[in-house]
Amino acid sequence: MLRLSSAVNTGDENMTNRIVIAGALGTVGRAALEHFDALEGWEVIALSRRPPDFDNGATWISVDLRDAADAKDKLGALKGVTHLAYATVYEMPDVAKGWLTREHADVNLAMLQNLVGPLVDASPDLRHITLLQGTKAYGGHLGPFKIPAKESDPRYMPPNFYYDQMDWLADERDRRGAGWTWTILRPQIVCGVAIGSPMNVVAGIGAFAAISREYGMPLRFPGGDPRIGEATDARLIARAMEWAGTDARAADEVFNIANGDVYQWEAIWPRIAKLFDMELGPRHPMSLARTMPGNADLWPKIVEKHGLLSYSLADLVPSWGFVDFIFGHGQRPNPHNMSTIKARKAGFHDCVDTEEMFVELLQEMQERRYIPR
């Protein structure tokens, strides 16, 4: 078990900012860790249930935020924390169905409470909390919503842990009379480099391509009819977290965050085929949730053949059902586009080319030996 060092307990006077990143091995958390770890004047404290498999300068704490006693024991000595980036989420085995349950909402609210309570007790001078949401705030998991979605749009039918968390966070600050501010970021289809994340389509693309190639098949798109999508690079979210935590214009505000363009899988799929040196085949709709688990025994052979890190297929892609959802399998086209004008007006102007993003992230997963070249 990774232990909290005395330097973190007492605080390092040479550091201007001390940030806790919850979910530091998730898609967003990992990008945030690497971003803040590279900044001058920031000390990073990373929270996760498992140790990292990459070099970094953070102090790691192994903690299960679902366990209130464990969280209090591990986090109650975190003095001098100035920022919290909350990038963790509890997902049920059937990810999409879980979104509609009260259990999903209750567990995610409790996790936030189990962290913020002892953290604020130990670090009363906390300045800022960044909380992540997404298009479920606009009912995207329920069906089509008004386009473009704006931060001022009314809420949709609960249960929804986004609403529970943001209400509790505001009430808790008022109850304590605390001085910290908060910012809520709402990204769209978050893409990054991560292992064990149930909502990371990049890993799903890489594994699907590698397995298809191993069988000698062309790369066929398995999703639904053509549709216009919108995505957010996790590295972009990390930069937005820095902005949100240091710019007064972001205080106590909600912002949609996206790459700034749109995409269609039909345009991206040829780029992926080229990256894996595969022939591009015609679209072949099929459920990856039904077909890919049956290929789990092939993955160790791919790992050995290409010298990859020894993760299982389930480690790499915990939820093929989520990949089906993002690919639009069995769905009619259902655009989920958001307006990012509010963030731009408030000073966050960063953007990313989505096609280039997918190629870069897949290449990084290859370089880190998660998927084959």
Where are each of the predicted segments found?
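Mid/C-terminal beta-alpha module of Rossmann-like enzyme folds, strongest
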Residues: 237-331, 336-341, 345, 362, ...
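NAD(P)-dependent short-chain dehydrogenase/reductase
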Residues: 171, 176-239
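Short, Lys/Arg-enriched N-terminal segments with co-localized hydrophobic residues
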Residues: 4-14
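N-terminal Rossmann NAD(P)H-binding glycine-rich loop of SDR-like oxidoreductase domains
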Residues: 17-39
